Each structure stands twice: as C-alpha cells, then as structure tokens.
Swiss-Prot record:
InterPro entries: MinE (IPR005527), MinE_sf (IPR036707). One of its GO terms (biological process) is regulation of division septum assembly. It comes from Xylella fastidiosa (strain M12). The keyword Coiled coil does not apply. Prevents the cell division inhibition by proteins MinC and MinD at internal division sites while permitting inhibition at polar sites. This ensures cell division at the proper site by restricting the formation of a division septum at the midpoint of the long axis of the cell. This is Cell division topological specificity factor. Keywords: Cell cycle, Cell division. Belongs to the MinE family.
Length: 85
C-alpha cells in the first residue's frame, strides 16, 4: 500500500505546483499592470501596418495608461521617411 500512497501524493504535488504557477502568473500580471492582450494587439497592428508601409518590429508601441478612473490605450507608430516607404 505504500507504493499506492506514494503515487497518490503525486497528484497532490501536481495540484500544488499548478496552484503555485497560477499565483506566479497572477503576480506577474499585477506587476506588469496591463492586460494580457496588449502584446497580441501590438503584433496584429504591426502586421496590418506592414501591408502598407515598410517598418521594423520596434516601430509600433502599445501601452495602457491609467489616468484616474480612466484607462487610455496609447498606440505609437514610428513611420519611416517618404524615401524609405
């Protein structure tokens, strides 16, 4: 029976690890201060802009700014000179 009890404890260990990981993820989200969709939004905006203008990956910046009770989505796109388009 000791072997069966040993194997059952692994499920508790896995559950404990899962709970710890969820806590770590929640803490990282709180520290970042932004929702999870911002990196995806930035990549999708970059792909749409690349259809029309040649820009590098660092040309699009998306930030969420908290202004009192309001949240402001700040999108900055650095466009190249006319000669580089």
């Amino acid at each position: 029976m000791g072997l069966i009890d040993f194997l059952r404890n692994k499920t508790k260990t896995a559950e404990t690890a899962k709970n710890r990981l969820q806590i770590i993820i929640a803490q990282e989200r709180t520290q970042r201060g932004g929702p999870d969709y911002l990196p995806l939004l930035q990549r999708e905006l970059l792909e749409v802009i690349k259809k029309y203008v040649k820009i590098d990956a660092n040309a699009v910046k998306v930030d969420l700014i908290k202004d009192g009770a309001n949240d402001v989505l700040d999108i900055s796109v650095a466009l190249p000179d006319d000669s580089e388009r």
